From Swiss-Prot:
Signal peptide: none annotated. InterPro entries: F-box-assoc_dom_typ3, F-box-assoc_interact_dom, F-box-like_dom_sf, F-box_dom. Residues 1-44 form the F-box domain. It comes from the Eukaryota. This is Putative F-box protein At1g30930.
Length: 376
């Protein structure tokens, strides 16, 4: 009589593996496939994944704007060197190029314009899973628009694309569009915005609310709040004279970050944060000085409370920097990533913190009949 491994032990072992390993387990038997698609296992796997977060880099390669997706373990201490062997990489195959304008939400990336020669010579909106390298070509709205954003509703587990029609100004007098990414026909629906504004590209989705920077009709900088589930807009005044350099998730709240560079003395950075406590109230934090001689961007705040800055352009070596604003720390913890900056044709980088493997995201892409990328 054969000794079998208890199913509870199998679940425990597989829940600590990778999404790729789970996918292989689906092929073992129908029973295993059913077990690993249960809600209980998907939530258990996500809990385990959150204990090993990664940093996701979206790297623009060459003058034709080809894209690579790289992720690496999110360092938990200073002076750490991340070897190239720890980097997971997916890349669009040769000839695929896209706009620099893209948005990220809950593990997926939405490109407003992407050209995939084997599919179509024209540029199309594309949804991509950087973990698996799969993508979905989305239908195009029948109207012109400069700005569109990806959001995620954590209650109904749905991704939606918000498309603001017309040119640089989103008028309250025209129809805008929204696309829900679910099984079946992908179809744009009209939606109205109660106020006229000029959208900007600084954006983030936090707990089912999509936030993006904008200017109102008076020329003041504002934040547009879009409830992804209920599809409602709200306007929040930033009381700032310039746009935020980045929007980050500050313990579940929106935080606008401003970086001030003193160019004459070698790029020391002054960082200022403004936290939105609710839609009616916000407050400024104190200045934090960061002594770094680099041209940096803000990736976000980790679950441990560290703000992550990264080098805007690829170099060799490539560094990310950590500091904790609550301690008002003046010392930057630097992490060297070997291999990321080795390609001289890489133009620009974007980064996202606390990137975790989520099986529900993989299922969403499967339901949309996603297509695998070719990996270089």
């Amino acid at each position: 009589m054969k000794n079998s491994i208890p199913i509870d032990l199998i679940i425990e072992i597989v829940s600590r593996s990778t999404a790729k390993s789970v996918a292989r387990c689906h092929c073992v038997s129908k029973q295993w496939r059913a077990i690993f698609r249960r809600k209980y296992f998907i939530e258990l796997f996500l809990t385990r994944s959150k204990a090993r977060p990664r940093i996701l880099f979206v790297v623009q390669d060459g003058e034709w704007s080809e894209w690579s997706f790289l992720s690496l373990p999110q360092p938990q201490n200073s002076s750490l060197v991340v070897e190239s062997a720890d980097i997971h990489m997916k890349k669009f195959s040769a000839g695929i190029s896209g706009s620099i304008y893209f948005t990220y939400a809950s593990g997926l990336i939405y490109f407003k314009c992407m050209r995939i020669p084997k599919e179509d010579e024209d540029e199309k909106p594309v949804l991509c899973d950087p973990l698996t390298g799969k993508y979905v070509i989305l239908p195009e709205p029948r109207v012109f628009g400069m700005y569109s954003y990806l959001g995620f509703d954590p209650v109904d587990k749905e991704f939606k694309v918000l498309f603001m029609a017309s040119g640089y100004t989103a008028s309250k007098d025209v129809d805008h569009y929204i696309l829900t990414l679910r099984t079946g026909e992908l179809k744009w629906r009209t939606i109205q915005c109660p106020f006229t504004h000029e959208p900007l590209w600084t954006r983030i989705c936090i707990n089912g609310v999509l936030y993006y920077s904008a200017m109102n009709s008076d020329g003041n900088y504002v934040i547009v709040c879009f409830d992804v589930r209920y599809e409602k807009f709200k306007l929040v005044d930033t009381k700032c004279r310039s746009e935020f350099n980045g929007l980050i998730n500050y313990k579940g709240k929106l935080c606008g970050v401003k970086l001030k560079y003193a160019y004459r003395v070698g790029f020391p950075v002054k960082l200022r944060m403004r936290v939105l406590e609710d839609v009616e109230k916000d407050e400024w934090s104190t200045y934090v000085k960061v002594k770094v001689k680099q041209n940096l961007s803000v990736a976000g705040m980790t679950a441990t409370g560290d703000i992550v800055l990264f080098m805007k352009f690829a170099s060799n070596p490539f560094y990310v920097f950590y500091f904790n604003p609550e301690r008002n720390s003046l010392e930057v913890q630097s992490v060297e990533i070997q291999g990321l900056g080795a390609n001289p044709d890489r133009i620009a980088c974007n980064a996202f913190v606390d990137y975790v493997e989520d099986l529900s995201v993989n299922d969403a892409m499967l339901q949309l009949n996603s297509i695998p990328l070719q990996q270089d």
